[in-house]
Amino acid sequence: TFGGGLLATCGLASTGAPTEVDGMAYGQHGRISHTPAEQVTWQVEPGEVRITGTAGVGTPGAPALRLSRTFSASTKEARLSIVDMVSNEGFAPAGHMFRHHLNFGYPLVSENSRLTTEVIPIGTRDGARPGPLSADQFLFRVADRPVDEMVWYADSGDGRAELVSPDAGVRLKLDWSIDTFPRFIVWRNASPGVNVLGLEPSTSRDGGRAEAAESGELIMLQPGEARTYVTEITVERL
């Protein structure tokens, strides 16, 4: 959830800013992060622990979308994979948006940390056009007073980012499915006492459902149709 933790899931019908479309209100980042999981199971196999569950969003007369999630954790290396399938269980086409919002803080995020990625920057929330994200060393500077958050948008490129932290002595590798996550968002709040970096495979930018519909980033799932999203996190010692 957005109260804390490594992963906050955004969707299923909207992500980004709150908007109203055709008389229906869509809250910031959607409802799925507040929806309890159902049918939760776990299984231990040689080399792997797997947890599965489902969660659905929908109201009478509105599209019915369901998330089926599998967490797989390796017992041989520091690797976690998240495999999500979002399906339209209704009888009419359903607009769909989705994002894996991954949060990182100290000591992974410090002034000595570096982000390496081949994603292709396409803009920022405030309308500026950024340079290569790997060259933005200010990503990791901690402010001496409260500052506004910053958001960068990128095309997913090869679907990989690496966060290297000499202070923590680790390299974190993030890989995601570029066929279903065509966008990548970097969110940074450098305020003292916050110091958080968000790395976010996404289907769209941050303007909300109305903007996504105008830009062509809103996905329409037909009845019975499903999309699969994959994100993998690997941590290695330097």
Positions of predicted regions on the chain:
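A short beta-loop-beta micro-motif enriched in histidine and acidic residues
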Residues: 99
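Surface-exposed acidic/polar loop and edge beta-strand patches at domain peripheries
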Residues: 1-75, 79-81, 92-95, 103-150, ...
